[in-house]
Amino acid sequence: MSAQASPTLRVVPIHDVDLEQVSDLVNRAFATYEIFKGQRTSPLDYLEEAGEDARVILVEQEGRLIGTGMIARAERFTEPEQMGPAGTERPDVAAPLDADHPWAGALYFGLAGVEPEVMNRGIGRMIVSHVERLARAEGFPRVALGTLLEFGLVAYYEKLDYRTVHTAVYPPEHWSIIVEHSHFEMVKDV
């Protein structure tokens, strides 16, 4: 039996990727949580959510996509119901973020997924590490992300030195999720 090749990682502009393949992987990964009604995303929804200037992280092994994530300037993700530091009012989406806002100037990381059969083998950590290195290299002061408590990833990110800057509890049906869920906005200085 031959050894498997090590995974390779590359970052490409969103318009240079097969969004069908990427959104299918995200859907398989998110399906493991069993809290979504239907699919997490579609190619069109992925593009709309990520934005035209987003870049996509692709982790491949022997020609097969096994991990992915999306990065873009965090200011793009300033929807009033989505973000704001704990205990403060939400920013006006038309206004730029205050310089002291935790997501101001940050690189946002989201829409991440790992092929279920290779989960817990370091692929996600490989992606997060690359995002952090890329943020430093490109002059971003921090990385921002959002996760649900129900995914069990808050403690994981805390171990990687991310800190929670806002939490919100949403009712079932919000974001096509079938249960009440807690959204955590987190940042890490890089």
Segments (PLM) and residue ranges:
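Active-site rim helix/loop that mediates acceptor-substrate recognition in acyltransferases
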Residues: 31-78
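Conserved acyl-donor/pantetheine-binding loop and adjacent beta-alpha core of acyl/acetyltransferases
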Residues: 68-111, 169-179
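Residue-level recognition of the GNAT/N-acetyltransferase active site
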Residues: 110, 115, 119, 148
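Conserved acetyl-CoA-binding loop-helix of GNAT-fold acetyltransferases
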Residues: 114, 120-133, 159
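Conserved catalytic-core motifs of GNAT/GCN5-like acyltransferases
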Residues: 144-146, 158, 163-180
